[in-house]
């Protein structure tokens, strides 16, 4: 498959464009470089704030939250909204967004809102103005900030969404129902860890595909896929899926191997072992016994194996 396309805040390793003229080195961004195509953007530079610049903040006013530059008194709200609207209307499609946390322009949800221009208390948290435009124009695009992505579960969820949606984008180009059916079959187990009911509804959609125009089915499937993947995978559902997969090979394993898997599953349930360890075990047995149905399941490797260690590291 082609590399997924990720929108990224330019200050995260691409240019020294922060308000203080600095660049931020981010390990996760660096690990992704071989596997994704980055589209860097700095919204604050694009609206002419310059580098370095006087800091901006979001200020709550009687007219709503405004993006203000206290040192100059400049109200940057409309300029940023205009840039965001134009950017997301004209930019090509992308598979995810990785933005700068707490930035008044790019923060996803943790941007401080102040009661006044200077020496004023924080009264709320919100999304940055550019990030809000992203959510309005591209609501199905997985979007995270580098702060939240220090969490292993959030990293895994983000990468699943990005790589799955990129795979579907390639599948959807031809609008061929046979390709969508194959896609759904390969993603069944992964989707079950997010929402079994959504997986079954998507299965009914493709099964009845002959009653509708193929393009309509493909578009509806894409919407359902994005909604299903937006739900974080549930541990209980993941354990059930792993047990189901284990059932395909368990009768051909030794007693010691079965015991090892079940004890590993319990350690995963207790958050003492990463999911990748169990998937690696299953992959080895699937290859050993040539279990073709399981070999095609994307859950076993939803993103490049080289990123497993990145996902498993940290908290």
Walk through the language-model features, giving the residues of each.
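N-terminal extension/subdomain marker
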Residues: 1-4, 16-18
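N-terminal glycine-rich anion-binding loop in soluble enzyme alpha/beta folds
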Residues: 16-17, 21-66
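Internal, conserved structured core segments that host functional sites
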Residues: 89-171
């Amino acid at each position: 498959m082609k590399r997924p396309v990720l929108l990224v805040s330019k200050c995260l390793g691409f240019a020294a464009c922060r308000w203080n003229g600095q660049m931020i080195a981010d390990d996760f961004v660096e690990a992704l470089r071989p596997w994704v195509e980055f589209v860097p953007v700095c919204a604050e530079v694009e609206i002419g704030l310059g580098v370095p610049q006087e800091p901006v903040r979001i200020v709550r006013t009687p007219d709503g939250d405004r993006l203000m530059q206290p040192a100059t008194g400049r109200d940057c709200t409309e300029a940023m909204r205009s840039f965001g609207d134009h950017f997301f209307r004209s930019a090509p499609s992308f598979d995810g967004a990785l933005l700068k946390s707490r930035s008044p322009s790019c923060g996803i949800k943790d941007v401080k809102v102040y009661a006044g221009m200077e020496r004023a208390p924080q009264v709320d948290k919100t999304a940055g103005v550019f990030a809000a435009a992203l959510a309005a124009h591209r609501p199905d695009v997985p979007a995270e900030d580098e702060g939240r992505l220090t969490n292993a579960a959030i990293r895994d969820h983000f990468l699943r969404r990005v790589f799955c949606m990129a795979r579907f984008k390639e599948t959807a180009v031809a609008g061929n129902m046979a390709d969508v059916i194959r896609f759904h079959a390969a993603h069944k187990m992964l989707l079950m860890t997010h929402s079994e009911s959504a997986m079954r509804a998507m299965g009914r959609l493709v099964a009845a595909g002959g009653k509708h125009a193929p393009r309509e089915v493909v578009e509806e499937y894409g919407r359902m896929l994005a909604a299903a993947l937006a739900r974080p995978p549930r541990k209980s559902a993941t354990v059930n899926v792993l047990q189901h997969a284990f059932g395909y090979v368990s009768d051909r394993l030794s007693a010691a191997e079965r015991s090892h898997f079940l004890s590993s599953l319990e350690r995963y349930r207790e958050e003492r072992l990463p999911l990748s360890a169990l998937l690696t075990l299953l992959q080895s047995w699937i290859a050993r016994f040539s279990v073709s149905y399981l070999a095609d399941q994307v859950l076993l490797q939803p993103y490049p194996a080289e990123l497993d260690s990145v996902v498993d590291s940290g908290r």
